[in-house]
Amino acid sequence: MNIPQRQFSNEEVNRCYLRWQHLRNEHGMNAPSVPEFIYLTKVLQFAAKQRQELQMQRQQQGISGSQQNIVPNSSDQAELPNNASSHISASASPHLAPNMQLNGNETFSTSAHQSPIMQTQMPLNSNGGNNMLPQRQSSVGSLNATNFSPTPANNGENAAEKPDNSNHNNLNLNNSELQPQNRSLQEHNIQDSNVMPGSQINSPMPQQAQMQQAQFQAQQAQQAQQAQQAQQAQARLQQGRRLPMTMFTAEQSELLKAQITSLKCLVNRKPIPFEFQAVIQKSINHPPDFKRMLLSLSEFARRRQPTDQNNQSNLNGGNNTQQPGTNSHYNNTNTDNVSGLTRNAPLDSKDENFASVSPAGPSSVHNAKNGTLDKNSQTVSGTPITQTESKKEENETISNVAKTAPNSNKTHTEQNNPPKPQKPVPLNVLQDQYKEGIKVVDIDDPDMMVDSFTMPNISHSNIDYQTLLANSDHAKFTIEPGVLPVGIDTHTATDIYQTLIALNLDTTVNDCLDKLLNDECTESTRENALYDYYALQLLPLQKAVRGHVLQFEWHQNSLLTNTHPNFLSKIRNINVQDALLTNQLYKNHELLKLERKKTEAVARLKSMNKSAINQYNRRQDKKNKRLKFGHRLIATHTNLERDEQKRAEKKAKERLQALKANDEEAYIKLLDQTKDTRITHLLRQTNAFLDSLTRAVKDQQKYTKEMIDSHIKEASEEVDDLSMVPKMKDEEYDDDDDNSNVDYYNVAHRIKEDIKKQPSILVGGTLKDYQIKGLQWMVSLFNNHLNGILADEMGLGKTIQTISLLTYLYEMKNIRGPYLVIVPLSTLSNWSSEFAKWAPTLRTISFKGSPNERKAKQAKIRAGEFDVVLTTFEYIIKERALLSKVKWVHMIIDEGHRMKNAQSKLSLTLNTHYHADYRLILTGTPLQNNLPELWALLNFVLPKIFNSVKSFDEWFNTPFANTGGQDKIELSEEETLLVIRRLHKVLRPFLLRRLKKDVEKELPDKVEKVVKCKMSALQQIMYQQMLKYRRLFIGDQNNKKMVGLRGFNNQIMQLKKICNHPFVFEEVEDQINPTRETNDDIWRVAGKFELLDRILPKLKATGHRVLIFFQMTQIMDIMEDFLRYINIKYLRLDGHTKSDERSELLRLFNAPDSEYLCFILSTRAGGLGLNLQTADTVIIFDTDWNPHQDLQAQDRAHRIGQKNEVRILRLITTNSVEEVILERAYKKLDIDGKVIQAGKFDNKSTSEEQEALLRSLLDAEEERRKKRESGVEEEEELKDSEINEILARNDEEMAVLTRMDEDRSKKEEELGVKSRLLEKSELPDIYSRDIGAELKREESESAAVYNGRGARERKTATYNDNMSEEQWLRQFEVSDDEKNDKQARKQRTKKEDKSEAIDGNGEIKGENIDADNDGPRINNISAEDRADTDLAMNDDDFLSKKRKAGRPRGRPKKVKLEGSENSEPPALESSPVTGDNSPSEDFMDIPKPRTAGKTSVKSARTSTRGRGRGRGRGRGRGRGRGRPPKARNGLDYVRTPAAATSPIDIREKVAKQALDLYHFALNYENEAGRKLSDIFLSKPSKALYPDYYMIIKYPVAFDNINTHIETLAYNSLKETLQDFHLIFSNARIYNTEGSVVYEDSLELEKVVTKKYCEIMGDNSQLDFTEFDEQYGTRPLVLPPVVTSSVAESFTDEADSSMTEASV
């Protein structure tokens, strides 16, 4: 194509260049072969040639006003190959808009949008000859010329002018660079180049300058020629060096070249040359030292700074513009000076606005030294000049070049610098300074730089509105139509904006470098500066990338023209397909329009919906804001309230601390500040109560004194005998009445007497210090006529302190008595021995025993031949007629907590009938339950002080009850502590309590360990059966059918039995051990026994003696068999042990060389008053519900006299009900520490609590089952090493125990023992059956039997497993039974009998049966399975005849076998026995041979069971409501002749034989000559022994046998022998083993059986099994009875002894 021969515009050149670059990138190496690329190359070369020629033409012409500043490139050029050259921007194109007037002060921005022609660059020749410097002009006309910045050409460095914008790349039209091999390098240079503001184009010369142009035109041309010659010379000089002045080193230049070449290779997908790889790898291996580079750069910048300041003046220039109404005048003579001043005027760095000054006379310049204008100078208006980015880069380049410039250039620059303009001053100041020849020109342009200014004269008066409008005075206010204001130069504004950005960047770079080089900056500051510096260095690259992206965007958005190759092909013709396609496109277009409309409609609906939603959300937001504000408001008030509460709590804590520290003064002061009305009320109440108590103390002292005085007057002794008793005058009481600040304690203990030593007649030993203090306290009470409570902890010697008091009164006070000491039966022998040991001088009578024994002692008491009487609680009531007649000086009650019930018979008897001057209570547990019980003790000893239980209880429990509120107000901690403190104040004078840890430092420690025992497989199965089904399941040996044992209403009690030993249930023992022989099964079936099998031999080997406490006597029976089996000697003490026998047992066990290792005791019987300190190990076999019972038991060994450390082992079955019992026991112990409880505290639990307990046990069992199924291991068994650590006291014992373990392990390995406990595989098959499936099958069978009627709904009854303290006390308030008492109580009337009917709550009301003298005292004790327990007497029974009765004792529970329900009863004809009830009733209750109850020791031995272990007797359960059921025991045993089947003659013969046998038994005497049959002649009296008929099913006696003989009722002599056997078996069931009746029955049966064999002539073994199963030697069933309160622990002993009853 031909190139048009015309001048190309800037836009055309830019468009051609972009297309040329696109083709080069698209075709790569093939670009030169593309025609379009060739054509564009020629066009660009032609345009470059045109611009070069134009520029040369302008330089040759030297026309003023058309010169342009040649701005060197500020960026250092990299060293290029030989053909490379620097780029210089061409001059601005003259083809600008013809009507555009450009001032010399205006900069023309060559941005991408304007596309100026100056963006094209032309290559310079090798010597840089084209780089011409502008000529200096000295003519006046230069005022309107563009300012030139001189560019030194030192060292021949090639500089170039660059446009301002970097968005488009500069053109490089050098032919050498159009080659492919140099193309990538040229692109890199273009992208990295910074585009600076371009040259400024001058406007046409003003008219004033043309007048003088001719004068200096020749001079100007001459100067331009000289400058060109100097430049060419300098270029030739630098050509020899060829080392451009650059900031890069040779290595850096080489690295840059390698990087650029590598980049080109990567872009073109070519391999990188090896030499470039080596250079790059070297730079990686040796990274540059950035600190050194920064230091070098800083030094470079510092050296550059002076040159920049010198060259700054060349950047500013001013053009004279003709202002309206102003004419510029120039003086020809001063043209040069003015021209120099204008051209070289420096630009102030702080002020961007300059005023053009027009000189007015010859003295236009005042002084060049101070830079001020002459007086005759004239101000010329001009436009402000803004320092742009191009100027800044120009300064940097000039500075770089000026470093090597000759000194002559610096001197020349300094000489041509004009004086700096000064800031404007007020006009009057300027006139004063230049008084002559000054001419002032008014300037209204605020942008002009002026010399002076005037302030407008503002009038302070009112301004008329008309003056603001146009009028003749103010012509300038007139608006002239058609005259437009001067427009805004947008190009200049853009240039200024870009210049400011460049300045800010440059300033930021300098600041970063300063921070990096400043060592004083912190590390973080320098690090941030380094980051900023790197970011700013990336700015050129970012601009280049942006330009590259924009060029492609422009190309993509441009329309294709014919210049593209796509249009070079031939245009094809239109056919039908095109029409169809067009039609289809049209339809698609219409469809799109329709869719667009639909879319717009949907969008409009969505917009409306969105608008509605937004409106709704705004309303919700407003609402939420209001709510949040309300919440914040509430939160604010809450915080304020919390802060106030914190302040109150802080004050309360301070008061509490003061109260705990006993700082009463500080507490009162803090309380006054708080003004707490509740505590103030409490204090007032406390003070009032203490005042009343103080007066009551005085009343009590007067009362005691009056009693003593009356006693003295009535007594026959002389008054001198009591002369030693301190007497208190009445005046002493009256004097203190007026003193309101009397100390409460000092009033009680007014008279003080120090005691230094014990009485001389106290000879048993030496009292300890704390015992001396106790004696002194008791003597102080005696001196002040007061009574008290000695409440020392168990084991601190209360007995000895009491004896010391009596001996002190006897010796020091000369008071010979009489003294009454009331003690429990179990401790009577201990008291007697202590008196004999410590006070033999005192004449002591132990008033107890049979009536005959007491009669002998009654005479001594009546005669007064005694000093001290020891008796029990029972004889206080029974022998009231005798003992109440004596006027006792001192009454001492041991175990005084039995006086808790103020309405008991004992308390009423003592208060009403007994006279005692002084009273003293001994107790180790004064506070067990609640405050009324404590009040009962205080009321007994101090009746005048504590006379109202109501006021006392209200005072401590509900102090705010009378403050007007109806709800119960709980006490806070502070109030509770305050109440406790005042309680201590009340009790301190009258109650003395010391703990062993406080006073007895030498007493060895007591260490308690809870030992967990695993269950055997049998225990686990039984436990789950009882827990889930409330019954146990055994196998019927006859039909191999599973049979369930019923009647276990008290489920928790049965669970405790299972945990202790499964053989408590005889049916289970028959399944596991049918022979009843003692073997390893006795300890393998129970985890506790297995543990004892390991522990007891170790204790025996190490010489430690053991006390084992039990709750159930049945377990004690099994324990006896176990101890005999492992060959350990033992002693046993339970409720059946008599008082005399107890003393003997204690003596045997405490003997120095005692052979007994173990002492097994019942917790209730053996836990009081026993001194067993020779034992140092205590084993609590099963935990009591009342923890104080266990504490009492522990202190049997841990007491004064103990030399060894006491180890307490509490056996607890793992995962059982025993863990719950232990937890509750610990909770009950908290009351001792707290003293006060919120509300009443008792030991009763409701049925809901019982059900909750069972539910918790079921849930726990279910959790354990899940764990077992999931494979989680249960708790491991206690290891032998752990047991040894518990038992061993030292290392030697540890070695012995370890050796024993090893020996036992070897023995078990030899025997092949795999598990010590019984495993499931060793159990009978019945225990492997699925009980649930069996029960479902039985239910289906029973439903079929009843034909769908279903069974009767069983009413659920819940039973408490707790017993109140009152019920527990019953066992303690009775002495031992009397065998020889003959007097009987009156029988109850029929009305009283009727009163025993069951009430609506399932409780039987009635009066307990008691015997005054002769008969036994029978009391219904609320406990289950108490077979061998003491009789407990309830004193409350004497108050009312309709009080709640306890449960009858002695019989086992009624147990039904499931298999016996459908069995047929025996025929009436086959039974020789008839009774009051119908035969069907009698026999329907007789189960099959396997029984569920227990047999006694006697029965077991008689039936040859193989082990002489007795079974405890229990009690039955009642229905709970309705009429009492018929009695199923106590039936008449009658043999009628009508039932006899033998002929009459045979019966007559049998009657003769039976009569001989009867007379033999009737007249038989033992070796002592005593007839044994007396007690068996008739049945016991129902009035005296009602429980006999409740226990024995068929009572029978010798009278019945005689009647049967007389009526010929016997078919054979064996039936007579069976009746004798029934008599003796009944006696052994009712009476205890070892009693007289028991032994007589054995002896009589033996001789009667022998006589029978002689008569019959047959010595074969007799079998009474079938007879025993039917007629009474089997466990019988009690009538259903429900008591008011159920025993808490349901233990098997009640600590009472039974009197042998005649049968």
Swiss-Prot record:
Task: Indicate which residues the UniProt annotation says bind ATP.
Answer: D792, E793, M794, G795, L796, G797, K798, T799
Query: What are the QLQ domain coordinates in residue numbering?
Result: 247-282
Q: Where in the cell is it found?
A: Nucleus
Which residue numbers mark the cross-link Glycyl lysine isopeptide (Lys-Gly) (interchain with G-Cter in ubiquitin) in this sequence?
Answer: K543
Instruction: Return the Low complexity bias intervals.
Output: 57-68, 84-98, 166-176, 309-327
Q: Where is this region: Disordered?
A: 57-176, 193-212, 305-426, 1338-1531
The Swiss-Prot or TrEMBL record marks DNA binding at 1446-1456, 1502-1513, 1516-1526
Where in this protein does the record say Phosphoserine is found? S358, S716, S1340
Q: Which SMART domains match?
A: AT_hook, BROMO, DEXDc, HELICc, QLQ, SnAC
**GO-annotated biological processes:** aggrephagy; cellular response to amino acid starvation; chromatin remodeling; DNA strand invasion; DNA-templated DNA replication; double-strand break repair; positive regulation of cell adhesion involved in single-species biofilm formation; positive regulation of invasive growth in response to glucose limitation
Enzyme Commission numbers on file: 3.6.4.-
Phosphothreonine: residues bearing it: T383
Listed Polar residues bias regions? 69-83, 100-157, 193-206, 328-342, 364-388, 397-410, 1471-1480, 1493-1503
List, for all copies, the residue spans of the domain called Helicase C-terminal: 1091-1254
Remarks, anything else? Present with 217 molecules/cell in log phase SD medium.
Q: What is this protein called?
A: Transcription regulatory protein SNF2
Q: Which gene encodes it?
A: SNF2
